[in-house]
Amino acid sequence: MITASVLFVVFIGVNLGMIIYGNSYVYPLSDISEIGDADCIIVLGAAVYDDGSMSYPLRQRVEMGERLYKSGISERILVSGDHSRENYDEVNVMKAALEDSGISSQVIFTDHAGFDTYDSMYRAKEIFKAKKVVIVTQRFHLPRAIFIARCLGLDAYGVAADEDGRYFNLKTEVRELFARPKYIFDAIFKPTPKFQGEAIPIWGEASLSDG
């Protein structure tokens, strides 16, 4: 009984601590210029449908990524998501949507092995050599993404993709409660993701990341 109580307190403490810490680096779009220029904007992937269309959360992320880019906070965008199968590709869907908005493919880098939040942040630093980043995802997800990024040594900030109207999904919110404690261990021990590859510096040629 005591053990269960202690675990519950730790569980709640980890969640609250990560939320408070992560949110201290979250900015509204209108104030993001306060952080100065960033190496890149990281747009994190989410589900795409069989017909290639974006899920609502992914559409929010891409649209906020576009707005951030056009605000001038960074000259580079890194779209990071799951492209583990030939018939499932979050990354090129995001890239195509950004191109349709008028952003040149020459400034859009693609990370095809961003299978989870940790992999995306690790690869942003180690493969794309970013140092200062602005992360775009939903508000519930930002604290964990920022926490992981900063534990890995990135100077990371965030803008909520849903700042104009919060995205809420009960299943997703509950899953996030359990994901935060799990990623504490990744942040501490810093495991190497399965997929590595050659360095593609974010200040170089975006076409080198195409796939």
Language model segments and positions:
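Proline-rich intrinsically disordered, low-complexity coils
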Residues: 28, 57, 181, 191-193, ...
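Electropositive, surface-exposed helix/loop patches at the edges of structured domains
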Residues: 115-121, 141-149, 191-211
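A transmembrane-helix-recognition feature enriched in membrane-embedded lipid enzymes
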Residues: 170-195
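A structural signal for short, hydrophobic/glycine-enriched beta-strand patches
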Residues: 18-174, 178
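N-terminal membrane-anchoring alpha-helices
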Residues: 1-35, 195-202, 209
